[in-house]
């Protein structure tokens, strides 16, 4: 694979729990001159703090088989507090401790990641039937300000993005929950950079074997056979590649091998 000057890395909540190892890897890559945009997850931590604050987390299943968080206003407050506060600070501290200059952002900063709030969403109800419900405070990303992100990357080693975008309600700008894989895919497409979706499994596994390569045209078919969670990663990787990223890799560390397209499941145009 060709060498790129910028890469986008998504670290899920399970990987973030092994933060020291991840921070070590990111530090090595940054010292080698690679500029990194890192998107973090942390849904389990959000769930933990939601329950502490008396807000029971709610998840919904979509007809596509994708499972997502349902974000009420109360849940949004906890989500932003944990993602953009507690977790972002913890990850930034680890990276800064390794001598890296880190800029921690959400999509509201610089109005850099814009999403459209979903007024209605279709879910699968308890009877297994499609049902439309209010969309809550969840968004679908529609725009990334690549010039802003690119200019910030010239000044730091790592940009750390929490999966929070901004939306508009009349004259008001509001925070919206966006899926971390979606945010990473949108950033990599806008920056035309490789995407590494780092997980705790070696790649997309079907029939007991890691799938080496998925073409964009095959993504929906293969996602339908993958488990909940992995199906979203496949779809978001395909979205990134179809919209500008040269390729995306799904798998476990080392992160550099994923960025180079040397391991995991590679998602490509053809």
Curated annotation (Swiss-Prot):
Pathway: Amino-acid biosynthesis; L-lysine biosynthesis via AAA pathway; L-lysine from L-alpha-aminoadipate (Thermus route): step 2/5; Amino-acid biosynthesis; L-arginine biosynthesis. GO terms for biological process: arginine biosynthetic process via ornithine; L-arginine biosynthetic process; lysine biosynthetic process via aminoadipic acid. The record marks 10, 233 as: Transition state stabilizer. Disulfide bonds: none annotated. One of its GO terms (molecular function) is N2-acetyl-L-aminoadipate kinase activity. Substrate binds at residues 42-43, 69, 177. It is found in: Cytoplasm. GO terms for cellular component: cytoplasm. Keywords: Amino-acid biosynthesis, Arginine biosynthesis, ATP-binding, Cytoplasm, Kinase, Lysine biosynthesis, Nucleotide-binding, Transferase. Transmembrane segments: none annotated. NCBIfam families: argB, PRK14058.1-4. Belongs to the acetylglutamate kinase family. LysZ subfamily. This is Putative [LysW]-aminoadipate/[LysW]-glutamate kinase. It comes from Aeropyrum pernix (strain ATCC 700893 / DSM 11879 / JCM 9820 / NBRC 100138 / K1).
């Amino acid at each position: 694979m060709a060498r790129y000057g910028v890469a986008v890395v998504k670290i899920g909540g399970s990987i973030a729990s092994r933060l020291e190892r991840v921070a070590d890897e990111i530090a090595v890559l940054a010292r080698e001159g690679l500029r990194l945009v890192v998107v973090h997850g942390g849904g389990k931590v959000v769930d933990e703090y939601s329950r502490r604050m008396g807000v029971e987390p709610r998840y919904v299943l979509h007809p596509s088989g994708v499972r997502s968080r349902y974000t009420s206003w109360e849940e949004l407050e906890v989500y932003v507090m944990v993602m953009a506060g507690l977790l972002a600070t913890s990850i930034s501290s680890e990276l800064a401790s390794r001598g890296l200059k880190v800029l921690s952002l959400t999509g509201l900063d610089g109005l850099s990641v814009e999403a459209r709030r979903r007024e209605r969403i279709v879910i699968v109800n308890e009877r297994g039937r499609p049902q439309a419900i209010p969309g809550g405070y969840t968004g679908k990303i529609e725009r990334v300000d690549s010039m802003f992100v690119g200019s910030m990357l010239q000044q730091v080693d790592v940009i750390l993005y929490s999966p929070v975008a901004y939306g508009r309600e009349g004259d008001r700008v509001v925070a919206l929950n966006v899926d971390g894989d979606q945010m990473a895919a949108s950033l990599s497409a806008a920056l035309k950079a490789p995407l590494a979706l780092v997980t705790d499994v070696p790649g997309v596994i079907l029939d007991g074997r890691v799938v080496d390569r998925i073409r964009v045209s095959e993504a929906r078919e293969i996602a339908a056979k993958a488990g909940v969670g992995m199906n979203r990663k496949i779809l978001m990787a395909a979205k990134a590649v179809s919209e500008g990223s040269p390729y995306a890799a799904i798998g476990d560390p080392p992160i550099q091998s994923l960025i180079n397209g040397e391991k995991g499941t590679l998602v490509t145009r053809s």
